[in-house]
């Protein structure tokens, strides 16, 4: 599943291109009771309803692949008789005409979706005639296959905000009646997955609006798929590993974390020419960690601790390098570095101006004195005049890393 696949499906969710055949659903209260069922021919909906439901369907294909959109695979056991994959295949083939199958689906969601409050389960059925494309992406007037799929959206239903309004029957301003409003979906899925412009019956596309809490319990217990962590979850886990290994020093932890992220960012940049949208991104394995941290001066004991925790956390499924990077933090750090470089450049220019100013001594001035000194501004306060053995002397202390030049001769 790629952004290109998602985009191809999503572009069809328009009034003149939409081919949804049916839409059905169930409204569930906070006691997990079904209050209302609906089953409609989608194209017969009133215009306003049509667009509202279409907008909900679009949301299930929104977000970032790998973070809000996950490709979940079915274990072999779920593809056997009685498995969830087989059940979804039957539901898709029924065209939503089998009420018993629909009720079983609603109960499957209600029993395995951990949510407190009212929500609406929506199901859309579609058959997309996938047209053949040439190498330059031009469409040919012939069908490659018919991609038949179901789209599910789970939408919270919340009370509208309290407020004042015009009460027509009483002809006055008063507290308005609060309605139960269907919100954009929190979760959803498309089955089967659409991959390389074809149906993949061994997996589905899972949608999570909140990548921090994607409802992993529904992925596994509800849909029967092997749960996956979102990019956000993987990044949070990785950052926790680093912080726990380094200790309580927040300043050191933040600096080391930033340096590690810069190393990972360079790794991604180095593979830019090799990593394409259609292929798997570069991953960070446990064996790759030492090379990412050797130039950051992290103690060997800390590196080993990070490696152990990393393997325990991610095992045989290492995360993609791009998932571990906080792009906003990296951008802010880059700006900070630029500001520091600029400050140093300004300081150097100031120093050069001071030196030039000191050097601009006229010949008359030089002839007036027997000794003319040119020193850096910070050395002026260290110069003393003392009488030594009856002779007036100038004392200029020199540090170990300092040198002096007298009329072109280095002392």
Each model region followed by its residue ranges:
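Phospho-regulated, Ser/Thr/Pro-rich intrinsically disordered or coiled-coil terminal scaffolds
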Residues: 1-4
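Long, contiguous regulatory modules within eukaryotic nuclear regulatory proteins
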Residues: 348-388
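Leu/Val/Ala/Ile-rich N-terminal alpha-helices, chiefly Sec-type signal peptides and the beginnings
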Residues: 13-28
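Extended, charge-rich low-complexity regions and/or helical-solenoid scaffolds
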Residues: 374-411
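Short helix-onset patch at the extreme N-terminus, typifying the N->h transition
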Residues: 6-10
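Long, hydrophobic alpha/beta structural blocks
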Residues: 24, 28-360
């Amino acid at each position: 599943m790629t952004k290109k696949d998602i985009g191809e499906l999503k572009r069809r969710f328009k009034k003149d291109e939409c081919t949804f055949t049916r839409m059905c659903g169930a409204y569930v209260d906070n006691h997990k009771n079904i209050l209302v069922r609906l089953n409609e021919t989608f194209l017969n909906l009133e215009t306003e309803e049509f667009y509202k439901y279409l907008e909900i369907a679009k949301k299930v294909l929104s977000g970032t692949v790998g973070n809000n959109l996950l490709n979940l695979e079915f274990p072999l056991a779920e593809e056997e008789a009685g498995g969830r994959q087989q059940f979804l295949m039957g539901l898709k083939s029924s065209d939503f005409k089998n009420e018993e199958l629909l009720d079983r689906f609603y109960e499957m969601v209600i029993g395995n979706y951990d949510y407190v409050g009212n929500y609406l389960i929506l199901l859309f059925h579609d058959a997309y005639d996938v047209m053949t494309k040439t190498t330059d992406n031009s469409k040919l007037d012939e069908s490659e296959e018919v991609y038949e799929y179901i789209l599910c959206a789970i939408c919270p239903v919340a009370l509208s905000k309290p407020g004042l309004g015009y009460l027509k029957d009483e002809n006055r301003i008063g507290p308005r009646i609060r309605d139960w409003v269907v919100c954009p979906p929190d979760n959803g899925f498309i089955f089967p997955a659409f991959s390389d412009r074809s149906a993949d019956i061994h997996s589905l596309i899972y949608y999570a609006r909140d990548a921090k809490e994607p409802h992993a319990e529904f992925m596994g217990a509800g849909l029967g798929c092997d749960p996956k962590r979102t990019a956000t979850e993987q990044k949070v886990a990785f950052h926790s590993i680093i912080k726990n290994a380094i200790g309580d020093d927040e300043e050191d932890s933040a600096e080391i974390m930033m340096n590690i992220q810069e190393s990972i960012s360079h790794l991604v940049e180095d593979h830019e020419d090799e990593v394409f949208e259609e292929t798997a991104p570069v991953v960070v394995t446990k064996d790759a960690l030492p090379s990412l941290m050797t130039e950051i001066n992290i103690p060997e004991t800390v590196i080993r601790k990070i490696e152990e925790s990393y393997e325990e956390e991610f095992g045989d499924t290492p995360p993609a390098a791009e998932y571990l990077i906080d792009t906003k933090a990296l951008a802010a750090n880059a700006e900070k570095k630029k500001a520091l470089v600029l400050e140093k450049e300004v300081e150097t220019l100031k120093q050069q101006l001071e030196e030039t100013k000191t050097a601009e001594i006229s010949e008359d001035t030089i002839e007036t004195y027997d000794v003319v000194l040119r020193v850096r501004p910070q050395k002026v306060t260290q110069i003393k005049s003392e009488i030594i053995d009856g002779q007036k002397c100038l004392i200029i202390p020199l540090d170990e890393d300092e040198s002096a030049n007298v009329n072109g001769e280095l002392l």
